[in-house]
């Protein structure tokens, strides 16, 4: 089967479109013939080796995190799906494997694809959707009706879905986005937009109950200062908090991951404590039940999968160039 294979860490030159052996469905798994895959910032980070200290790869390896496709076969014990079913999934975070014509995935990580959008476009839902859903949910921000939420960098895949889900929860949603991104976040349900190119969050003087940060970087102190005491900041881009890397790290690297997370986040955790704010970095986990709920919202017309661009597999380099430009409004998809 054809696959995008990561041959070493590096830039796009480290990736090759080549033939590799096809996987088979083990017990409790489904084998999916890929229709399309979603590209995500974490894919570029993986390629560059950002996680190699705690989760080193054995090269060559097939990367990729999410896909849509048609069930080819099912393994022993699988009753929820059958050959021919249209499905979407977030694949194993430790094994990856989405960037291939066939992928074997645990059945409990899979959901029936939404009927309301093309199967190709549905590939953009799993990772961004589950990240937003879990961040806003009871395990993390626990967003409640009427609360004031800030989402930074909201015009991308995760941000647009998070904006919509927060709006559906009855929160007052402020986002940061460029002028070009404002129409997208407004359509998703943003109540207020801060153009980060013309003013900072602090300059606006707004106060928030909770913040969902998608940017990271040197703005963290400013964000903490904008949150009411007793509030929360959850990030997928800031320094990792203690325990947050455990499931990502290989077992032999978990002691190192624990040290890295404590040291890397020490400064921001001190600042958060001083501000009376809870700080947390988190990584989403595959969840077929949660994914099915997102599909329900899509089919009900309450949630959209915003697609920035679609590329054929042969143009994978251009697809990654678009992703890494940081100008995509919504998802960049690669069609198989």
Feature annotation, model-predicted:
Residues 85-86, 102, 148, 168, ...:
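Residue-level marker of beta-strand positions
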């Amino acid at each position: 089967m054809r696959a995008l294979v990561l041959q070493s860490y590096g830039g796009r030159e480290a990736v090759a479109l080549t033939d590799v052996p096809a996987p088979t469905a083990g017990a409790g798994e489904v084998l999916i013939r890929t229709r399309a895959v979603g590209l995500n910032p974490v894919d570029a980070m993986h390629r560059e080796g950002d996680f190699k200290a705690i989760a080193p790869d054995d090269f060559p390896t097939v990367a990729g995190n999410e896909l849509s496709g048609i069930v080819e076969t099912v393994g022993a014990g699988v009753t929820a799906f059958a050959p021919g079913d249209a499905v979407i999934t977030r694949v194993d975070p430790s094994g990856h494997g989405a960037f291939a014509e066939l992928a074997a995935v645990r059945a409990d990580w899979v959901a029936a694809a939404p009927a309301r959008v093309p199967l190709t476009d549905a590939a953009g839902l799993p990772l961004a959707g589950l990240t937003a859903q879990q961040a806003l949910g009871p395990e993390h921000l626990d967003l409640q009706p009427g609360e004031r939420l800030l989402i930074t960098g909201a015009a991308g895949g995760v941000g647009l879905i998070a904006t919509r889900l927060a709006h559906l929860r009855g929160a007052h949603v402020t986002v940061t986005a460029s002028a070009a991104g404002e129409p997208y976040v407004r359509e998703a349900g943003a109540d207020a937009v801060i153009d980060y190119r013309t003013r900072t969050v602090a300059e606006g003087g707004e106060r928030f109950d909770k913040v969902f940060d998608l940017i990271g970087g040197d703005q963290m102190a400013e964000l903490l200062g904008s949150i009411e005491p007793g509030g929360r900041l959850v990030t997928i881009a800031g320094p990792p908090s203690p325990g947050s890397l455990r499931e990502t790290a290989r077992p032999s690297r978990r002691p190192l991951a624990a040290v890295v997370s404590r040291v890397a986040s020490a400064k921001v955790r001190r600042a958060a404590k001083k501000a009376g704010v809870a700080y947390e970095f988190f990584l989403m986990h595959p969840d077929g039940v949660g994914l099915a709920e997102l599909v329900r919202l899509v089919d009900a017309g309450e949630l959209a999968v915003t697609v920035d661009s679609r590329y054929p597999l042969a143009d994978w380099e251009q697809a990654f160039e678009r992703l890494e430009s940081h100008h995509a409004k919504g998802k960049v998809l690669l069609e198989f």
